């Protein structure tokens, strides 16, 4: 069963950012960010807030299939 816990890969594409850029912003290894993007592992709640801030989105947009933009 493929459970997507986050939409990080989609949000990175929407914001025209790369795994490498995000890894640099967070001081994390690029392989770690790649695992988050493929839902192989998940970032901590604290890190989710940091990711949201870096990308200019809400945490909800990172984890919900129905982002707030879909409702506008």
What are the language-model segments listed below?
Residues 2, 10-11, 15-16, 35, ...:
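Short, charged recognition helix plus adjacent turn
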Residues 21, 32, 61:
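Residues in the helix-turn-helix
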Residues 22-23, 51:
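Short alpha-helical "recognition helix" segments of helix-turn-helix
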Residues 28-43:
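Recognition helix of helix-turn-helix/homeodomain-like DNA-binding domains
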Residues 46-61:
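DNA major-groove recognition helix of helix-turn-helix/homeodomain DNA-binding modules
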């Amino acid at each position: 069963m493929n459970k997507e816990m986050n939409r990080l890969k989609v949000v990175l594409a929407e914001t025209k950012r790369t795994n490498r850029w995000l890894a640099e912003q967070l001081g994390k290894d690029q392989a770690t960010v790649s695992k988050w993007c493929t839902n192989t592992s998940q970032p901590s709640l604290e890190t989710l807030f940091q990711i949201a801030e870096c990308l200019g989105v809400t945490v909800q947009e990172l984890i919900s299939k129905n982002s707030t933009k879909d409702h506008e």
